[in-house]
């Protein structure tokens, strides 16, 4: 059974990653570019917006690339991430729904180095209209990680939501 979303159409693909999650991953990867952002929700000092047309432009970056793609059409973002990882010689980390039954996941397995499943809870994304975390995500989340200088290992790893939250919230408290 498919769960229908009550999110207005204009907000469906504009949800922001919670800061605690981004901060925890930023410690590990050192993000320089947010390749799917708006001027309101960019998480890096450098970002691409819808106007920049990220699917048809280069993701020039001097550090790792963060990508939380529109969930309505993930496949082209998977293809672009694989391409830009090699072209930019930078790690690309993509946050996606944990759904291994879809075609874009099979496509990702052709080139991804790591699939990191976030366990023990679902991510509450930031609603575009309110700026607040909203509960009720219908799926878990996982990270697809492309690394430029190794042959893809297609490894599956896990990390708990609680561990990421503790690290990420610690960053905010220390700042």
Across the structure, where does each feature detected by a protein language model lie?
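Class I S-adenosyl-L-methionine-dependent methyltransferase catalytic core
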Residues: 1-175
């Amino acid at each position: 059974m498919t769960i229908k979303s009550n999110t207005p159409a204009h907000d469906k693909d504009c949800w922001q990653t919670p800061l605690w999650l981004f901060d925890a991953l930023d410690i590990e990867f050192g993000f320089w570019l947010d390749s799917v952002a708006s001027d309101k929700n960019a998480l890096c000092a450098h970002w691409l917006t819808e106007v920049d047309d990220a699917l048809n432009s280069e993701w020039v970056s001097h550090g790792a690339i963060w990508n939380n793609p529109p969930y309505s059409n993930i496949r082209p973002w998977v293809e672009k991430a694989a391409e830009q990882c090699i072209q930019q010689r930078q790690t690309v980390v993509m946050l996606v729904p944990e759904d291994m039954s879809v075609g874009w996941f099979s496509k990702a397995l052709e080139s991804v180095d790591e699939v990191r499943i976030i366990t023990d809870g679902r991510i509450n994304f930031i609603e575009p209209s309110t700026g607040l975390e909203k509960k009720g995500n219908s799926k878990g989340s996982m990270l697809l990680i492309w690394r430029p200088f190794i042959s893809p290992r297609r490894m599956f790893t896990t990390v708990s939501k609680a561990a990421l939250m503790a690290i990420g919230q610690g960053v905010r408290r220390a700042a």
